[in-house]
Regions:
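Bacterial N-terminal signal peptides
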Residues: 10-18
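Sequence/structural segment immediately N-terminal to covalent heme-attachment motifs in c-type
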Residues: 43, 55-84, 88
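Gly/Gly-Pro-rich "capping" loops immediately C-terminal to redox-active cysteine motifs
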Residues: 64, 79-122
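Electrostatic cytochrome c docking/interface patches
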Residues: 29-66, 122-126
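Sequence context surrounding c-type heme c attachment/ligation sites in exported
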Residues: 61-69, 80-81, 106-110, 128-131, ...
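Bacterial N-terminal signal peptides that target proteins for export
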Residues: 2-10
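Sec/Tat signal peptide C-region and signal peptidase I cleavage site
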Residues: 20-24
């Protein structure tokens, strides 16, 4: 009797699995596949090497005006913070109990700044800035941190070449251009 029950149980499990596998590939019958153009609109990631940076350019002067208009209400007139996070300062604090993890002290790649601003800022209108505006704001924030001079202009060819102060502070499968911590 136990063999007969075991065979029936095995057969029932196999039948259930077979039905589940056969139906797994069926669509729900709603929606449609995204077009390549629709996918391209969301494929906006930027790597530390600069791959994915869009055409465009922006300089510190332009970035200062854009920052005053679209960023200062949250990050302060000069990136000092309040009510949101500080963007400047904090160099030398990463080993402190409460380090200031700012763009200038913590972030390993300038392209990370571009990617974050492009995707998520301003907070009330993410992805609303043009590539030129994002290059300009990136230039201004890096200028405020003393990383680039006032006459800096960024574009897809030079942004990834910026050497950030904490570029060697991370262990990464994809180290920033020009080096990075080795695992």
């Amino acid at each position: 009797m136990p063999d007969r029950i075991a065979r029936r149980l095995t057969l029932a499990i196999a039948a259930t699995l077979a039905v589940g596998v056969s139906r797994a590939g069926e669509p729900y019958g709603i929606g449609r596949p995204a077009t390549p153009q629709e996918i391209a609109g969301w494929d906006i990631d930027v790597s530390p090497s600069g791959a994915g940076l869009p055409p465009g350019r922006g300089d510190v002067r332009q970035g200062e005006a854009i920052f005053a208009d679209k960023c200062a209400a949250c990050h302060g007139a000069h990136g000092e913070g309040k009510p949101m996070d500080r963007l400047v300062g904090g160099v030398g604090t990463l080993r402190d109990k409460k380090p200031d993890k700012t763009v200038g002290s913590f972030w390993p790649c300038a392209t990370t700044l571009f990617d974050f601003v492009r995707r998520a800022m301003p907070l009330n209108a993410p992805q609303s800035l043009t590539p030129d505006e994002v290059y300009a704001v990136s230039a201004y924030v890096l200028f405020l941190n003393g990383i680039v001079p006032r006459d800096t202009t960024f574009d897809a060819d030079n942004l990834a070449k910026i050497k950030m102060p904490n570029r060697n502070g991370f262990v990464s499968a994809q180290p920033p251009p020009g080096g990075g911590a080795k695992p």
